[in-house]
Amino acid sequence: MKIQLFAMAATVMALIACNSNREMTPQEGYIGPSDIQITDGHMSPEVLLSLGRVSDPQLSPDAKTILYGVSYTSIQENRSVRNLFTIPVEGGDPVQLTMDGKSISAARWSPDGEVIYFLQGGQLYKAPYREGRLGAREQLTDIPSGVEDYALSPDASQLMYVTSVHSAVEVPSDSDPMLDKAQAYATEDLMYRHWDHWMTEIPHTYVAALGNGIIKEGVDILGGPEFLYQLPNGPFPDIADLAWSPDGRYIAYACKKLEGKEYAFSTNTCIYIYCPLTGETTQVTFEGGYDTHPVWSPDGSRLAWLSMERDGYEADKVRLMVGDVHYDAVPEGQAAGPMVDNIRDLTAAFKYNADGPVWAEDGKSLYFAALAEGVEGIFNVVPEQEPVIVRLTADNLWFDFGSPFGVLQDGTLLTTFTSMDFPTELVAVNDNAIRQITYENQHILDQLDKHETEARWLKTVDGQEMLTWVLFPPKFDPAKTYPAIEICLGGPQGTLSQGWSYRWNYLMMCHQGYVVVLPNRRGTTAFGQPWCEQISGDYVGLNMQDYLTAARNIKAEPYVSGVAACGASYGGFSVYYLAGIHKDVYDCFIAHAGIFNEEHMYMTTEEMWFPNWDNGGLHEYAYEEGETGPGGDGITFGGIKQGGSPWSNLPKAKRHYDNSPHKLVRNWNTPILCMHGGMDFRVPVDEGMAAFNAAQMMGVPSKLIVFPGENHWILKPQNALYWHRSYFDWLDRWMKD
């Protein structure tokens, strides 16, 4: 591996990424940008982990400066640290504001742009901002359970913050304080663990006044810790699910006010409006699936949000809804507060999923992002009764654009963009003209050899067209032969677009000498809802044929010597299933966090709504409390409609479980690597161990790698490095001469 790493003294580090001669003193534990030197022109795991990660841009009130964060990683220290930067909207050199040894997050401008608020170490701070410098910091909160996220009211006189409260899951010290060293979890209901943690605590959001000394306690929006709902919703609580009204009198929020089994099987998340002054709450939406991300129009006369229609189906079309807000009319039987009516779907005639709605400054239209035909673009819609949606980024631009974080007076959109060739950067877009603002990793990416990417539309077995990206190694020569990697997408709903990943990094794969094949098979979300929905109840059907179509297409090329199939989560399921049916199509397999035994998976995963729908139930949530045993209809058990369960009598569910990958192990004969995180509660680690054990019992060359402290993803730097090295070691062993 031809890479040189140069260690730089702190005095030199202090000058990196700054646009002036000001010297800053790095704090203990500070990690700065990498000066990695690449001598062979190839992206490698070490190069990947050296990249700075740009995130959370915020436009200043005068629309002249962007505040953002960059995380840098130390493999040796096995950690990353995030610090703050600014850059002019017009571009130029960034200014580094902090050089801390502990990460800083959620930086926000004050309304006058003279103060910057931020989180560090679980508490909120502020510091004056003058002439490109941060002044002395002042601590604003001292919350015992810490502040996880926050949002200031428009005039910065009030604060809402997210912290943790005790859940229904019991620990020994709840009944006896003397047992404070005992470790056990007790529950009498579902949803006792989520993603990677036992649910001993859940998020609640509080409101407090700013400016009266250090905040030690606020008012719980939900009414108190005895209300065991999550606000924001887990497992990744996001303050974007709460929004201050422009006058600071109200907070719109999204919440799934359910617990236990009901929480586990339902996606019914509703929009509410809370009044901090009176403590009263008005419910805006009542039924259906996820309602999230409320945003007020600038004058407060309208409220927009994202919505799914069907309860229990997390891959339903994401609609952009808007309603008119009335402050002088309250429905009978509801608490005093504004009423929202004339609710309409602005995207009814739009075939894609809306994301990240942002109001235009004049309140006459909304911007949003959407994955459309394999790339993510920015769109605009005027909220009239017959809305017209206009795409603002050209569909032939091979980038993924995020939703705008700022709109300038001339209509220029400030946003983020990525591609398979570079990670997140800040960019300005106007009439399809793109002006890149940040170049965080240009000094590293410029050292890499160039490669080519091709978009192929392949004919599927049922005569449809499937977008398949193909990446070729640098200096590709069609007269030579190369091994190929087919990526099996997780989800199963998602899209192989022009996004950037720090694990499934396609640029690195092609730089390691592989042709990389990315089929947007049935179930992907950027090609309309029918293409997405087809996969539900048909995991072993058309999408598997789509994989085989793409594999055979690339294998027929004279420059391809063999094909490996690799994937995570549902992609791991795909690998395990393909291993039992492919015959001689594939030469090697890698599965990370894959589903192996669908019956076991149904009874050990946490978010039950997903398998209950996708495994063949295809029905909305229904529950009758107090019922036990079979309901007599073949799909209701314990009062819960469970058409996607192993005990369902629905034909699609029966077919699903009859074709679980573990039942096809007798056909396995191809080398397989199984990797899994020990803290993965979405697809428990037993799935990976069972697949490996089965491969061993069949005499199939196989390897198991378990990361005890990792979840569904591999996040710690040294673990990530080992994961990548193991990935390529296995591929090279079986795919290269």
Language-model-detected regions and their locations in the chain:
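Predominantly five- to eight-bladed beta-propeller fold
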Residues: 24-31, 35, 81-82, 164-224, ...
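Conserved beta-propeller blade repeats
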Residues: 51-66, 101-116, 144-159, 192-205, ...
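Non-catalytic accessory segments flanking enzyme active sites
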Residues: 56-58, 160-162, 185-186, 191-210, ...
